[in-house]
């Protein structure tokens, strides 16, 4: 396919138009008085959102060169979302400001490589200063503040803070769509996996259709049990103890299942069989997790063990097990804290090494199940459109809160970027490098300016006053007052601010050093095939 090529100024100007189109659509959502953007969906109702990355991903421009510019800024939002989970609009605003200011200087004759050096130096200094001024997050109220600012909803802030308090910082918090209008929190304590009883005859509570085992023994194996003789020795030992038994196996079938059910119904012993969770290597890892949590052993041929040789010492123990048609929950496993901590450390190490998003999610789930539990926030709303928008906001708030726990918090509302302004301005540099630093200084003002504009105020007036205020004092756009941001609970996670700045600078530097842009030439529309009449008809036809 033939290509269109543009060079230097012409290339950068075309891409800048795309950058501005996308950034202008995204930046109206910034701050407490930011507006929403409506996105058309081919199926179903339109999506109304104020989430920067969601808007950025939807934008496709007709002109190929403009579209490349837009996609570069969408990449800033996307990367910030991947790293910090929030701050995508701030990242977009910063990128637009750096690209716009940088392009002015390149047009005036500045060397793009010198500008790049200055931009990188300024951002490195700003990031170091952000680390210095960040405060560790403490207590439930701080977590609630971070979440409430991100979601623009205090109720959501309280909900997320409660969820994190109940499942711990390593716990998994997931979002589900509620069937009602209200948003609620549901916490599953202990380890839960998505496998239910092998037979409904094993239930102990017919009203709730669940089996509840108190202080049970737990047999853990990756083998299929089809012959009762295999587990008879260990079964007899459990019956002598007068305790219930939970069997976790690849499958329990045929004669073995029938014998267990008959004896359960006769009241000889209380037993529930469930299939092992997961598949392949993940199944082995999850069975090992259950064994460590319950101080049992995985009976597997890989370790030279068979079911006949299993003794009561090989079995795990737990305070309580609840088995429903779909799930099994093990509460109060008796495993030693040291072993559980060691296993958690092992999973954390794997988390750092993995590059697969799917593996990361599964490892995070395993970590949560060992560390504390799983919280589910059930999001409710009056309409489907509102539900989608609310779910996106809560997702952002959740990511924001996790980022705050990791790297601490800084003053919100763009104030922290202005707080590092003086430090960046003091960097010794000259020539194009100094110009690069000035580009970053101008960009640092932009989030505050945009928040003020979205609140219906003159942005430059707010920026100039902020430069003269003490560190930590900022403009509360929601009330129009000047307050101490940290004390007022207007905070941003340091990780979100840092990621937004670094990603914006990275793309801006690449943009300014671009000298040629190559795009596919649009295909000419081929003429439609003429009709038969135009051909004078076919011979022999009337």
Swiss-Prot record:
Give the organism, scientific name: Bacillus cytotoxicus (strain DSM 22905 / CIP 110041 / 391-98 / NVH 391-98)
The record ties this protein, via InterPro entries, to: Chaperonin_Cpn60_CS, Cpn60/GroEL, Cpn60/GroEL/TCP-1, GroEL-like_apical_dom_sf, GROEL-like_equatorial_sf, TCP-1-like_intermed_sf
Location relative to the cell = Cytoplasm
Q: Which UniProt keywords apply?
A: ATP-binding, Chaperone, Cytoplasm, Isomerase, Nucleotide-binding
**Which EC class is this protein assigned?**
isomerase
Q: What is the superkingdom listed in this entry's lineage?
A: Bacteria
Which E.C. number(s) belong to this protein?
A: 5.6.1.7
GO MF, one annotated term = isomerase activity
Among the GO biological process terms of this entry, one is: protein refolding
For this protein, the record's HAMAP family field holds: CH60
**What is the protein's known function?**
Together with its co-chaperonin GroES, plays an essential role in assisting protein folding. The GroEL-GroES system forms a nano-cage that allows encapsulation of the non-native substrate proteins and provides a physical environment optimized to promote and accelerate protein folding.
Instruction: Give the principal location in a single coarse category.
Output: cytoplasm
In the UniProt record, the gene name given for this protein reads groEL
Is this entry keyworded Lipoprotein? Answer: no
Subunit (UniProt): Forms a cylinder of 14 subunits composed of two heptameric rings stacked back-to-back. Interacts with the co-chaperonin GroES.
What family classification does the UniProt entry report for this protein? Belongs to the chaperonin (HSP60) family.
Pfam families to which the protein is assigned, alphabetical: Cpn60_TCP1
Q: Which reaction does it catalyse?
A: ATP + H2O + a folded polypeptide = ADP + phosphate + an unfolded polypeptide
Q: Name one GO cellular component term.
A: cytoplasm
Q: What is this protein called?
A: Chaperonin GroEL
PROSITE patterns associated with the record: CHAPERONINS_CPN60
Which residues participate in ATP binding? 29-32, 86-90, 413, 476-478, 492
């Amino acid at each position: 396919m033939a290509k269109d090529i543009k060079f230097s100024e012409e290339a950068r100007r075309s891409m800048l138009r795309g950058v501005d189109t996308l950034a202008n659509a995204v930046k109206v959502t910034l701050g407490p008085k930011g507006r929403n953007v409506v996105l058309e969906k081919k199926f179903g109702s339109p999506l109304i959102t104020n989430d920067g990355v969601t808007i950025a991903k939807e934008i496709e421009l007709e002109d190929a060169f403009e579209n490349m510019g837009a996609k570069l800024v969408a990449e800033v939002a996307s990367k910030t979302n991947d790293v910090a989970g929030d701050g995508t609009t701030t990242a977009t605003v910063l990128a637009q400001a750096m690209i716009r200011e940088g392009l002015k200087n390149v047009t005036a004759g500045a060397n793009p490589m010198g500008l790049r050096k200055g931009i990188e130096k300024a951002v490195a200094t700003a990031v170091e200063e952000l680390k210095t001024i960040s405060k560790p997050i403490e207590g439930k109220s701080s977590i609630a503040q971070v979440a409430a600012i991100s979601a623009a909803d205090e109720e959501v802030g309280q909900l997320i803070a409660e969820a994190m308090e109940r499942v711990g910082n390593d716990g998994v918090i997931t979002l589900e769509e509620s069937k009602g209008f209200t948003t609620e929190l549901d916490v599953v304590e202990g380890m839960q996996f998505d496998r239910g009883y092998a037979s409904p005859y094993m239930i102990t509570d017919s009203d709730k259709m669940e089996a509840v085992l108190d202080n049970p023994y737990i047999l853990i194996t990756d083998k299929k049990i089809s012959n009762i003789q295999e587990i008879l020795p260990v079964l007899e030992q459990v019956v002598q103890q007068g305790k219930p038994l939970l069997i976790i196996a690849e499958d329990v079938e045929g004669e073995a299942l029938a014998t267990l059910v008959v004896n359960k119904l006769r009241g000889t012993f209380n037993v529930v069989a469930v299939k092992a969770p997961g598949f392949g290597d993940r199944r082995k890892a999850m069975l090992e997790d259950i064994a460590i949590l319950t101080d049992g052993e995985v009976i597997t041929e890989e370790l030279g063990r068979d079911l006949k040789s299993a003794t009561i010492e090989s079995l795990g123990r737990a305070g309580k097990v609840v088995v429903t048609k779909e799930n099994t929950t093990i509460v109060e496993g008796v495993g030693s804290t040291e072993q559980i901590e060691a296993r958690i450390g092992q999973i954390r190490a794997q988390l750092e090494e993995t590059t697969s998003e799917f593996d990361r999610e599964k490892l995070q789930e395993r970590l949560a199940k060992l560390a504390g539990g799983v919280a589910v926030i059930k999001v409710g709303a009056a309409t489907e459109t509102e539900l989608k928008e609310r779910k996106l906001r809560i997702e952002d708030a959740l990511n924001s809160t996790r980022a705050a726990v990791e790297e601490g918090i800084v003053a919100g509302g763009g104030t922290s970027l202005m707080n590092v302004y003086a430090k960046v301005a003091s960097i010794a540099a000259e020539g194009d490098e100094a110009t690069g630093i000035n580009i970053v200084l101008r960009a640092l003002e932009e989030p505050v300016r945009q928040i003020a504009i979205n609140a219906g105020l003159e942005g430059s007036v707010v920026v100039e006053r902020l430069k003269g205020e003490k560190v930590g004092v900022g403009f509360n756009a929601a009330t129009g007052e000047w307050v101490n941001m940290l004390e007022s609970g207007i905070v941003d996670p340091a990780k979100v601010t840092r990621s937004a700045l670094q990603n914006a600078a990275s793309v801006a530097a690449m943009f300014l050093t671009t000298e040629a842009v190559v795009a596919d030439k649009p295909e000419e529309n081929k003429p439609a095939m003429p009709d038969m009449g135009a051909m004078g008809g076919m011979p022999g036809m009337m």
